[in-house]
Curated annotation (Swiss-Prot):
It is found in: Secreted. The modification Isoleucine amide is found at I76. Its main location: secreted. Belongs to the allatostatin family. Residues 28-56, 80-86, 188-197 form a propeptide. Residues 161-197 are annotated as: Disordered. GO terms for biological process: neuropeptide signaling pathway. Neuropeptides. Keywords: Amidation, Cleavage on pair of basic residues, Neuropeptide, Secreted, Signal. GO terms for cellular component: extracellular region. The modification Leucine amide is found at L96, L106, L154, L184. This is Allatostatins.
């Protein structure tokens, strides 16, 4: 029994001793040594105060409960970035792989003989929006349509005459005979070639 009471007394003394040391350590931590520590502890106690030392904007901020949150400029097939500060950007500048008007089709071939600087650029960059205005696009499309009407289809091949000249360099009557020449790999027969010359 004596050993039991001595173990109990020594454990109580041990706990009492560490209780006093622990309280003094807490008391030392609670009293700040300088004003810098006081500011640090206040920031720790108030989690809503943030360090605004960095000048960059936050990506997501709450403005008000009735105002809209910031709009992000992304999308599926987004091809350009508007650098102007306009809220909406250009009209209809979104979509799945948005491209030029009427620049689609099965087996569509883009010959850039007249426009060598375009280099098959199907997407409209934003670096010069005046160049890509509706008037310029309409002029380009009218010129493109006026040259070879109905020149599309699966397996469409450019027609060259026996003289080696392209289709557009002949007289207008010769072009009218070839106007509706399209289809699945359609070619002229020898009889048709002789009658057209």
């Amino acid at each position: 029994m004596r050993s039991r009471t001595s173990v109990l007394t020594s454990s109580l003394a041990f706990l009492y001793f560490f209780g006093i040391v622990g309280r003094s350590a807490l008391a030392m931590e609670e009293t700040p040594a300088s004003s810098m520590n006081l500011q640090h502890y206040n920031n720790m106690l108030n989690p809503m105060v943030f360090d605004d030392t960095m000048p960059e904007k936050r990506a997501y901020t709450y403005v008000s409960e009735y105002k809209r949150l910031p709009v992000y400029n992304f999308g599926i097939g987004k091809r350009w970035i508007d650098t102007n500060d306009n809220k909406r950007g250009r009209d209809y500048s979104f979509g799945l792989g948005k491209r030029r008007q009427y620049s689609f089709g099965l087996g569509k071939r883009n010959d850039n003989a007249d426009y060598p600087l375009r280099l098959n650029l199907d997407y409209l960059p934003v670096d010069n929006p005046a160049f890509h205005s509706q008037e310029n696009t309409d002029d380009f499309l009218e010129e493109k349509r006026g040259r070879q009407p109905y020149s599309f289809g699966l397996g469409k091949r450019a027609v060259h005459y026996s003289g080696g000249q392209p289709l557009g360099s002949k007289r207008p009557n010769d072009m009218l005979s070839q106007r509706y020449h399209f289809g699945l790999g359609k070619r002229m027969s020898e009889d048709e070639e002789e009658s057209s010359q």
